[in-house]
Amino acid sequence: GRWRGWDRRGGEEMLELNRLYNMDCMEGMKQFPDKYFELAIVDPPYGIMNKTKRGGQRSPHKYKVRSEEWDYPPTADYWKELFRVSQNQIVCGGNYFTDYLFPNNAWIFWYKHQPVDNYADGEFIWTSFNDKQGKCFDYMYYGAINSETDRFHPTQKPVALYKWLLKNYAKPGDKILDTHVGSASSLIACYDMGFDFIGFEIDKDYYEAAQERMRIHMQQQT
């Protein structure tokens, strides 16, 4: 099949497509030439996971969050490298990273209808597509995500969101990059829609859970 995972910590040759790698995305992106990926769809940590987006304390037990590895906001070097290896970018929670993103009018607002786990009832998604109008993705997030039995990541996005993004912003044949895979929703969407992809997840536990989620999903497709 197209999907494979790989626990990899280094190497010189360019990484293979259609794999999820358990490694630092900064090390991974270094192995690709300029503008190799037509589109990067990323959901970096905001650095605020010890609190909800509304300011309250999160439950310390619902999800495994290790601040030293997972919940660390990207540095300026990350954004420089992301823009180097990708032609266009979509950034979930882009309003947290405006210091690094150029201003434009092509934002997406993901309307969730009701808050989830004390999170806001919507999320801003930045895109680099200056030639496109702003859009709204209206999705009954709460019922849909809680009906999934495989939710294990604190900022897990529904596969439907990524499929909508790919349908509206990607072209057939595009190679897709996700630097912080988390729950693998992005990779499942790429797999289902026939896009080549590369994913990175630095956290070993999230990596293994994402691998298992992909494996089960693929079995269900056959």
What are these regions (language model features)?
Residues G1-L177, S183-T222:
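Class I S-adenosyl-L-methionine-dependent methyltransferase catalytic core
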